[in-house]
Amino acid sequence: VTYIAVYRLLNELLKDKFGVETTIVDTTDIEKVKAAIRPNTKLIHIETPGNPTLSISNIEKIAELAHANGALLSVDNTFASPFNQRPIELGADFTVESLTKYINGHGDAMGGAIIGKKEYLDIIRAQSQINLGATISPFNAWLIMRGSVTLPLRMKQHNENALKVARYLKTVKGVSFVAYPGLEDHPKHDVAVKQMKNGFGGVLSFGLKADHDTYNRFVTHLKVITSAVSLGHDESLIVFLGENDERQYLYPEEFHNGFFRFSVGIEDAEDIIEDLRQAFEKENLI
C-alpha cells in the first residue's frame, strides 16, 4: 500500500502517458515480490511504513532481490523520516522523502527530495527536473531548511507520543484495531525493530466498533487534535479514510469499514490521550 497520489502515478499517468508497465504487489511478502519480477523489471518501489496501513516491508531483503534481478530499489521513507530509518544504508538505491512532512515539520511548506547516487541523480536533474519543472521555490526551501534543524528533537517526541497513544488505544473497548509498528503485536514488529533504529514514527491507524456517523461525531468532540489531512506536523492531525478508496483491495480486512489515520504531534502525550478519552466517552466507546 502506498500514498494514493503515487498509486495513481504508477497505475494511471506512467501507464497511460508513458507506456510504463506496473505490477502492484504486497511488498510485505518477499515471495510475492519475487513472483512479480519480470525480465523487463527495472525498478521496485516500496513504502515502509506504508500509508495508511502502517505495513512494514523488509528493505534489506527486497534490495537483495532487486539487485539479483538487475533492478533498482526506491523506498518512500516519509512515514519513518531519515531520523528513524535510512534505506540507502539498508541497500536501497534511492530514498524518497516528502519534505512537506517530518523534515519541515510545521505544515507550512511543500517539497520533496530524492536521495541516491550522483550518477542517477544527474540523469534525474538533467531530464525530469529541467524538462518537467519539479523545482522547489526559494522560500519553501528556506522554510524546510529552518524546520530540518529540529528534526531529531521533534522525531524523538513523535516516536514517544505515538507509542504511548497506540498503547492507550489498545485499552479502549470501542477501538476495533490499532496499527502501529512499535506495538509488539504488529505482524512485522521484528522487521521494524531491525530497520527503524530510533523509533517507529508518529503515525498510526485505528478503527472503531461503530458506524460512519459515529466516526463523524467523534472528531467533532476533539479539542487538541485537529481533524485534517496531512501528517508529520508539530500538531496532531486525524483523518477518516477507507471508504470509496480505490486501494481498498490492498488493505487488510479490518480496514475495510473505514478507519482513522492519526498523525500524533509533539504536544504533551497526556493532553493528546485525554483529548481522545473525552471524545470516546461522549460516544460511549469506553
Where are the model-predicted features located?
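Conserved PLP-enzyme active-site core in the AAT-like
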Residues: 1-174, 179
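Short N-terminal helix-initiation segments at or just after the protein's N-terminus
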Residues: 141-151, 200-210, 280
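Generic non-transmembrane alpha-helical segments
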Residues: 65, 164, 168-172, 217, ...
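PLP-dependent enzyme catalytic core of the Aspartate aminotransferase-like
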Residues: 1, 10-12, 16-17, 35, ...
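Short acidic, gly/pro-rich beta-turn/loop elements at beta-sheet edges
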Residues: 122-124, 214-216, 272-274
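Conserved C-terminal alpha-helix-loop-beta "cap" of PLP-dependent enzymes
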Residues: 177-260, 264
